[in-house]
Every structure is written in C-alpha cells, then in structure tokens.
C-alpha cells in the first residue's frame, strides 16, 4: 500500500514527487514510457518565463512568477542547468507598444518587480544583435532558460534518492476505488494500491481522469515546431527574444539554450491527433518570422542541426486544472501547457496543500537530502586538436571521449547510467550527457555509447535505434535543410 501514486513522470509528476519525498510517505510514480520526461516536458521552449504573459485571473498567471522565483535555489540543489539571462518582448510598431503596456500591467498585477518597458536606445545597449526595426521592448531581468529534460531527470533522481519508487513502461489502464483505497492497474498487469492518486499524465489527462471520476474537460494536443542551430551560436544572443504574443502562444522566439545553441520557434497548431513530425512549410515560416527579431547575420540555415515538435496539453478550460476531483483523493494536475515548466515548483506546493486539506499526515523525514550532483559540468568546447587523442583511448578509460562533437567522456556516461534509473536507449543517455546532441547528431557516437552501456550493465542493449527511428516520424533533418538552401540559392 502506497500513500501516494503519481501518474506521469513529466515536469509536474516529478516536481510533486520530489516535493513530497521530504516527508515520511510511500510514493510511487507510474510512467508509460521507457524514461522520464518523454512528453511535453522534453520538447518545449526551455524558457523560465517572467510571469507577465498571463492574467492573474487565470491560475497559470498567478503561479508563474512564484514558480520562477524558485528556480535559482532549485538549480543550486539539483544542478540541472538554469541561466537567468533575461527576456525581451520586442515591439516593431505602436500597436506592439500598446501590447507591451498590457503585458506590463499584467506583470504588475502578478507581483513582478523586475521588469520595465525600454526604448530603442536601451534595447540596443543590452542586446546588440536585436533587429534595427525593433523600437522598444518589455524587459524582464529575472526570466531565463533552463534544460527542461535535465530538470525533470534531476527531480526524479533526487526523489528516488529520497525513497520514491518509479515504474517505467507502466501505462495506467484502469483505476478503481473501494473503502478509501485506490487500485491502479497498469499495462504490465500489476495492480498498486494507494490512499491518494495524482493524475499528472499530460496529454492523457482526460483519459486517465475519466477512468475514476466524472470529467468535464478535454485535453487536446497543440503542436509547435522548432529549429535548433549548432552549439556556439547561442553566444550571439544574450536574452530570450520574443515577438508580441497571440491568443495561442507567446510568439515566435529566438533564444540561446542553456548549452549555447540557438533555438527558434514555436508556431501553434491545434491538432486532432498526435503528430510529432516536422514539416518544411511550417519550419520555413518560423525561420522567416524569427529573422524579424535579429540582425541579418545572426541566423544561418547552414548551422541547422535538428528540428522537433512539442505537443502542449491544452485544456478545454484554457487554464491549468489543479484540483481534487469528485472522486475524493483523486487529484487532477492537467492542462499544464505554457508556462508549465516555470510554474512546476508552485504546482507541487499547491498539490501538497490539497493533500493536507484531504487529511494526509506529513511528517518531515530527517534523512531528506535535497541535493543532487550534476552529470554535466557546463564548459566550453576545447579545440578538437587538443583533445583528439582522447577519442582513441580504449574502452574502460574514464577520460576517453565517446562523443567528439560535445566532448562527452566515458566517465560522464557511466555516471549517468548509475543514477537509479536503468537507461534502455541511446536517447536516454543523450538527454543526460549531451552525447549525440552535436553537429553529427549521433552518427559518430551512437554505437560507442551503446558499447559503454553494454559494458556497464553487463547485458545487450536491445533498443539500438534513435527514439524517432521505427516510430513512423518524419522530421526535417540536415540533408533536407541543405536541399532547401540549394532551392533558395537558385
């Protein structure tokens, strides 16, 4: 019997698990995929938002800024990668300036004290590569970027260190309640019992909710496509650059990532079905719109390395849904689209409060450890001529460079393999170490990573493909972009 079962190991489920792991509770996370952070938490803009883009009349508007204020301390404890580099919402005409004033007023209502509307002169002084057409901006000093999948991984690793249990490849197929006890059945045929159940299942939120309680909301996928440029390009931009938002999104952004790539996107398309593919027409429209924000020499399609699609779990209510359901003790945490990553610490606090109201006994665990060592130590890449001899070192040498593009050592990979979650794919290692995230996108290092995995675990790795291989996904890649460049040059 568990005290709490959490369905979903995305940013909400992970944040809640880590928050509750400080108490003497038996907690289980059930995740349907083969790793944590496999849904919206993996594929998004990676922004720690300011807290001005949503009205305080909405729950997501009220909890974004308190969530954002938690990130510096969280990163000090968990070492997942957070940089408070600031954000700029750009204005290109007087209508845009009116929009900035509305955003500023919403920010004030939400309690922000680190934003201002700046003129063209100050804008140029803090962001030299911003477009000459920008006439002003809303500047939020405390906004920033993080590595969202590393954030979720860190939360789960720390929760596991503090006694939480995790079951992967365990999709919830049925939930029943009898005599104040929930019975949760998974696709593995296992049944787990608990006093409380938290539904943090992302796009499956309405489906899971309807298994046990009356559900008056829908969750539908809203897709957004992105382009990523090679490492090092991010140094051309200091802040996160937004254009003025639409009703569906915060506008096309150009930003550096925590690991110093340029990230461009997303658009926002409501989908009938899940589609994680990327499309030439959409990506080229995103690229064209992004060029509006920066000087001509900032973006270069020849530096493109990858495209991806994120699916936001948009609710029919238009807002976050965080509440005890009509089936007492079954708590919905669904419809968590943007700014979900930023709000996640506050979401976890809210769920703790709901559990307290429902009568859970929270006793502090004196052995609780909030700290987690980093897997990746942030560093600039060395000149390859200085490190090329490390590539040829034999298997078993901790200094051997397994990935040459990102210069990932064997000791880093072995560290990632021993963090409480057995990794079963190359991509799982990639998300933790950046092996395969460089210019060649794993062409050189995939088999080398799998070799280390097999040596460390002592058994063959059955899944030897990239996550996207064999899944039917069609994504625009470097070869496709090169063909587009050729067409553009004619």
Indicate where each model-derived feature is located.
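Helical element adjacent to the flavin cofactor pocket in flavoenzyme catalytic cores
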Residues: 138-196
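C-terminal catalytic lobe of FAD-dependent flavoproteins
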Residues: 249, 258-259, 274-401, 408-412, ...
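Glycine-rich FAD pyrophosphate-binding loop
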Residues: 22-43
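Flavin-dependent oxidoreductases
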Residues: 15, 175-180, 186-265, 269-279, ...
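N-terminal Rossmann-like FAD-binding beta1-loop-alpha1 element of flavoenzymes
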Residues: 2-29
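Dinucleotide-binding Rossmann-like beta1-alpha1 core, especially the glycine-rich loop
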Residues: 46-126, 251-252
């Amino acid at each position: 019997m568990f005290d709490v079962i959490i369905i979903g190991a995305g940013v909400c489920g992970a944040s809640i698990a880590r928050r509750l792991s400080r108490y003497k509770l038996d907690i289980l996370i059930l995740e349907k995929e083969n790793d944590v952070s496999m849904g919206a938490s993996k594929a998004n803009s990676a922004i720690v938002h300011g807290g001005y883009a949503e009205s305080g009349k909405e729950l997501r508007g009220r909890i974004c800024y308190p969530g954002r204020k938690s990130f510096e301390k969280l990163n000090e404890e968990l070492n997942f990668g957070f940089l408070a580099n600031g954000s700029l919402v750009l204005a290109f005409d007087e209508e845009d300036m009116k929009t900035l004033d509305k955003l500023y007023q919403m920010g004030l209502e939400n309690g922000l004290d680190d934003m201002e509307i700046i003129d063209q002169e100050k804008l140029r002084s803090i962001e030299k590569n911003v477009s000459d057409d920008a006439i002003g901006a809303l500047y939020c000093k405390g906004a920033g970027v993080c590595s969202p999948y590393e954030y979720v991984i860190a939360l789960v690793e720390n929760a596991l260190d503090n006694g939480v249990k995790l079951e992967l490849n365990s999709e919830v197929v049925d939930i029943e309640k009898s005599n104040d006890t929930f019975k949760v059945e998974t696709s593995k045929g296992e049944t787990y019992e608990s006093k409380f159940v938290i539904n943090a299942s992302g796009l499956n939120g309405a489906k899971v909710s309807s298994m046990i309680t009356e559900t008056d909301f829908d969750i539908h996928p809203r897709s957004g496509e992105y382009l990523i440029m090679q490492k090092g390009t991010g140094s051309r931009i200091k802040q996160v650059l937004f254009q003025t938002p639409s009703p569906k999104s915060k506008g096309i952004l150009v930003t550096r990532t925590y690991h110093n790539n340029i990230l461009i996107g997303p658009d926002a398309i409501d989908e009938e079905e899940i589609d994680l593919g990327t499309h030439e027409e959409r990506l080229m429209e995103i690229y064209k719109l992004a060029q509006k924000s920066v000087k001509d020499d900032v973006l270069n399609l020849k530096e493109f390395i990858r495209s991806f699609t994120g699916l936001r779990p948009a609710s029919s209510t238009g807002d976050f849904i965080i509440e005890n359901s009509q089936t007492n003790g079954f708590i919905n945490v669904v419809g968590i689209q943007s700014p979900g990553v930023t709000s996640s610490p506050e979401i976890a606090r809210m769920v703790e409060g709901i559990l307290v109201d429902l009568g859970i006994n929270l006793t502090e665990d004196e052995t609780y450890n909030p700290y987690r060592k980093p897997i990746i130590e942030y560093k600039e890449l060395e000149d390859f001529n200085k490190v090329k001899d490390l590539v040829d070192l034999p298997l078993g040498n901790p200094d051997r460079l397994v990935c040459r593009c990102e210069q990932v050592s064997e000791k880093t990979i072995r560290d990632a393999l021993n963090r409480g979650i057995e990794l079963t794919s190359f991509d799982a290692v990639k998300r933790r170490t950046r092996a395969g995230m460089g210019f060649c996108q794993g062409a050189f290092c995939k088999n080398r990573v799998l070799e280390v995995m097999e040596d460390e675990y002592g058994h063959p790795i059955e899944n030897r493909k990239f996550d996207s291989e064999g899944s039917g996904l069609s994504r625009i890649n470097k070869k496709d972009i090169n063909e587009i460049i050729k067409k553009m040059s004619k």
